[in-house]
């Protein structure tokens, strides 16, 4: 997992509440357990005018011109700005995989569904909860300013607007440490690799019948 320390990224505004995981990545694309390759089908039913299928070439599919992420000014966005209860619905780790593969590294919202919130941290995405008033102000600024970027400083726990105004956010200390160091569940386990090897070696001596 890549480290997350500081990001200066273009912001895309998804002005919707209760965006569920089926909207983020529809169910027909859940057959793969690889973490990559889901980006082209993120928000598939909103991005395209037809129904997508796994393995389909998306280059010729008609795009929905009214969907915000299809607008040229938001191409390459790394920060997603949205409303309350983002990531609700069924539990699927494919949802953060799709968002990360699409290019998003941070999501700013009024609130998140608990399981989705946890899955973001496990996959290197920083979910940030801000008060509704701050969210509303950001929406107004993003929509009024082409090329609007935010600095997301995890070390300082602040979202910094172009005018220099910093908006503090809270994050669990352990999750912060994991993102700063790029530790996912496997990375955390590998930190104890030497002790694991020592345990396995001792176990082979103490319980040799398990390995015969």
From Swiss-Prot:
Domain of life: Bacteria
Pfam families listed in its UniProt record: Aconitase_C (PF00694)
Cellular component GO terms, alphabetical: 3-isopropylmalate dehydratase complex
Designated gene of the protein: leuD
Protein family according to the UniProt entry: Belongs to the LeuD family. LeuD type 1 subfamily.
EC number annotated for this UniProt entry: 4.2.1.33
Keywords per UniProt: Amino-acid biosynthesis, Branched-chain amino acid biosynthesis, Leucine biosynthesis, Lyase
The organism of origin for this protein: Dechloromonas aromatica (strain RCB)
Catalytic activity: (2R,3S)-3-isopropylmalate = (2S)-2-isopropylmalate
Single GO term (MF): 3-isopropylmalate dehydratase activity
Signal peptide: none
Protein name as annotated: 3-isopropylmalate dehydratase small subunit
């Amino acid at each position: 997992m890549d480290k997350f320390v500081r990001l200066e990224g273009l912001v895309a505004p998804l002005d919707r509440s209760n965006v569920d995981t089926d909207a983020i990545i529809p169910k027909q694309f859940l057959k793969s357990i690889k973490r990559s390759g889901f980006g082209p089908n993120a928000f598939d039913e909103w991005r395209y005018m037809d129904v997508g299928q796994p393995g389909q070439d998306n280059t010729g599919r008609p795009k929905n011109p009214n969907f915000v992420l299809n607008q040229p000014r938001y191409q390459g966005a790394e920060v997603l700005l949205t409303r309350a209860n983002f990531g609700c619905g069924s539990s699927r780790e494919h949802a953060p995989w799709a968002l990360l593969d699409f290019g998003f590294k941070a999501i700013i919202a009024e609130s998140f569904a608990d399981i989705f919130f946890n899955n973001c941290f496990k996959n290197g995405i920083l979910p940030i909860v801000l008060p509704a008033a701050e969210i509303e102000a950001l929406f107004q600024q993003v929509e009024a300013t082409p090329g609007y970027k935010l600095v997301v400083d995890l070390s300082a726990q602040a979202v910094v607007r172009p005018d220099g105004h910093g908006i503090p956010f809270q994050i669990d200390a352990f999750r912060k440490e994991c993102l700063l160091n790029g530790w996912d569940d496997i990375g955390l386990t590998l930190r104890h690799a030497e002790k694991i090897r020592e345990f396995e070696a001792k176990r082979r001596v103490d319980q040799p019948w398990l390995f015969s």
